[in-house]
Amino acid sequence: MRLLLTTTAAALVLSIVGSAQDPTAAAITKGVQYLTVEVPKWKAGHSCYSCHNNGDAARALLAAGAKGFDIGTSLDDTLAFLKQPAKWAQNKAPDQFDDRTLATIQFAGALAVAERHGKAASTDLEAAAKLLAAAQQADGSWQLDDSHSVGSPAAYSALIATWSARTSLIASGMQPDNFTIVQADRWIRGVTVEHVVDASAMLLALGDAGDVMAENLRRASLSILRTGQAPTGGWGPQAATAPQVFDTALAVLALRSLESEPRLARSAYRPEQLTDAIATGRKYIVSQQRQDGSWPETTRPANHASYAQRISTTGWALLALLQ
C-alpha cells in the first residue's frame, strides 16, 4: 500500500511539473478558470442568455471539459437553456443586440458540442436544426444584422455564420445531399476570399471537399494565410494589419483542420511548414493572455473595449489551443 501511495504521489508530482512546464496547458487552465466564473454571470445579472457567454464561451468550456479540464457546474444553467430550442425565441436581448439569427447559430453551435460529448440529447439538436434551416436565406447563406463586416468574435461575418450553421446541421444528422446543405455549399463556393478572416472561414467551410471550385478556393485561402502570418506568429484581419487573437485563433483552427490531411494544404505548405504555422500561431495566442485568464478582445476597429467581444475572443482562443 505504501509503495502504491508513493507511486501515485510521484505520478501526481510529475503531472503537476509537466503542466507547469507546458505554457499551453497553463494558458488553457487559466482561461477555463476565467470562463467558469464569467459564463454564469451574464444570466444572473441580466434578463437573457447571451451569444457570447452562453454561445461562444459555453462551446469552449464544453470542449475543455471533454479534454479533462475542470469546468465544475458552470454550464448547468446554460445547458438547461440550450436543451430547449423551442424557448430560444423567448430569450430577449437588448434591442440593439437582439440578432435572432446570430443567437440561433451560436446557441445551436454550443448545443452541437454538448450533444457530441453526451451533455444533450440528439433530439434537442434536431429541434435546433429546424430553427437553423428556417433562418437560411434563399441564396443558401445565413445573414446577420452585421454580416457585411469582416467579422468579429461575437458578430460573425456571413461566411462564418454559414459555416457554423452548416456544421451544426451536419452534426444533427442532416446529410450532405439535403437541399439545405446543397444550397449552403453552393453559396460558399460563390464567395470571393479577400482577407484572412474569410480565408480561415473558407477552409473550415470546405472541409475536405475535392471538387474543382473547392480546390480553387482552398488554394486562394491558403495563399492568404501563408503570406498573412506575422513574424510573431499571429494573423490580423488583413495580411498587412497587426495580429489579433481572434483572427489568429480562427487561422489556427482552419490550418489544424488540414493537418491530418496535409495534401489539402500542399499548394502553400509542406507538412512540416503547416505544423510550424499552427505551433507559432498557438504560441502567439498564449503570449497574449492576460493575467486574469482572459484574452484581449478583438474588435472592429481594433483596440476598443467590449465585454462581449472579450468573452467571445477568450472562447475562440481556448478552442484554438484545445484542438
Give the residues covered by each predicted segment:
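Primary recognition of N-terminal secretory signal peptides and signal-anchoring hydrophobic helices
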Residues: 27-34
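Short, Lys/Arg-rich amphipathic segments at extreme N-termini
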Residues: 34-41
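Eukaryotic RNA-binding helical-repeat scaffolds
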Residues: 74-79, 83, 222
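An alpha-helical repeat/solenoid feature that recognizes helix-turn-helix modules
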Residues: 22-27, 41-71, 88-130, 137-182, ...
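Sec/Tat signal peptide C-region and signal peptidase I cleavage site
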Residues: 16-20
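Bacterial N-terminal signal peptides
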Residues: 6-15
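Positively charged n-region of N-terminal signal peptides that target proteins for export
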Residues: 1-4
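Short, Φ-rich (hydrophobic/aromatic) sequence segments
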Residues: 35, 187-188
